[in-house]
């Protein structure tokens, strides 16, 4: 099965490279961190409002059987970037900021960065004339030598820090700053829309990887209050109103990206 998939991918990339720029599709990959498959309306969640994601599912394709071989941050990101099983590269757990020998359970130490000789999806698309961009959370290497701009991305804005205004920043890019009081997901959407508009005359690949809905939980108060009231009416502890608000933030982000396209 793996060989068939790899062959299909190479065939697709070869076909893309033979098309004229006018016929090459623009590609936007939105990767929402730690969101459960049943946390959106198109998978029968009736608590959180996700109209724009639901619309994409209705008008496009929806997976009903899917398995993640490494359902945490770095392994999944490794698979998406490389097209390979995480174990082949050695990123089998999330890449921590430092070695953690104090943990009560010590897992095998994973590879601590995506190797630079790994061919990423961005590098595979470059020969076909694509301009490539990466925005949001990276988590495939902590040093500057392992960032997206070293892995085939023409534009990168790696953002570090929690969700709420004033708590995050673009690493190494003092020229990219959020508006005063801006929620992180909204800022990530702004950067993505700018990339789309700046590259609309040529084929582009954009990967948008917001930090939401990863912990620590945090959302704007108006949305949190909306779901707090909704949860109170249900008279149960779950779902979590802050988490629900974060999902709605992501849904709005998706809607803005679709509208920009």
Predicted regions and their residues:
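Formylglycine-dependent sulfatase
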Residues: 3, 19-261
